[in-house]
């Protein structure tokens, strides 16, 4: 069964890839569907991986820290879980006047499947909320 440690490691690798400038094609390797979209539940937006690449390209010094995550087993074959939890996220606008740093607690709701290769893949990726800290730079998604 997929474990919380595996989910955290998988999520950390995805976040590190995005923060390092991963292309949409490189990000797609983390998804079961190479044309996946990221769903932003709190405002109704959906973001293609191409748009996700462009969005993150404007920031520097991105950092993600996992908060608490719960797993709900969904299926044994293929092996799937629903992973819900929080991630503290910060990223800096290099050319913007202060405040430059986005600081937010982000709600994550993911369906993850173990592929035949053994690798984990996002089946569904939803951001359920972005709680911006009082000293955060504004962000319009």
Stretches with model-predicted labels:
Residues 1-30, 34, 140-141:
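Short, low-complexity N-terminal intrinsically disordered segments enriched in polar/charged residues
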Residues 4, 24-25, 29-80:
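A solvent-exposed, acidic/Ser-Thr-rich amphipathic alpha-helical stretch
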Residues 6, 10, 51, 104:
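Soluble or luminal CAZymes and related metallo-dependent hydrolases
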Residues 11-17, 44-54, 137-141:
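Short N-terminal signal/transit or membrane-insertion segments
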Residues 54-141:
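A beta-strand edge to alpha-helix "cap/lid" segment located at domain peripheries
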């Amino acid at each position: 069964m997929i474990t919380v440690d595996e989910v955290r490691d998988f999520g950390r690798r995805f976040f590190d890839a995005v923060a390092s400038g991963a292309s949409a094609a490189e990000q797609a390797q983390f998804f079961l569907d190479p044309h996946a979209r990221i769903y932003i539940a709190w405002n109704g937006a959906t973001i293609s991986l191409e748009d996700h690449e462009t969005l993150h390209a404007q920031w520097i010094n991105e950092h993600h820290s996992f908060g608490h995550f719960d797993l709900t087993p969904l299926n044994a074959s293929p092996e799937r879980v629903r992973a819900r939890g929080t991630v503290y996220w910060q990223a800096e606008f290099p050319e913007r006047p202060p405040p430059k740093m986005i600081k937010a607690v982000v709600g994550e709701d993911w369906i993850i499947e173990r592929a035949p290769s053994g690798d984990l893949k996002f089946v569904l990726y939803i951001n359920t909320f972005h709680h911006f800290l009082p000293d955060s730079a504004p962000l319009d998604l």
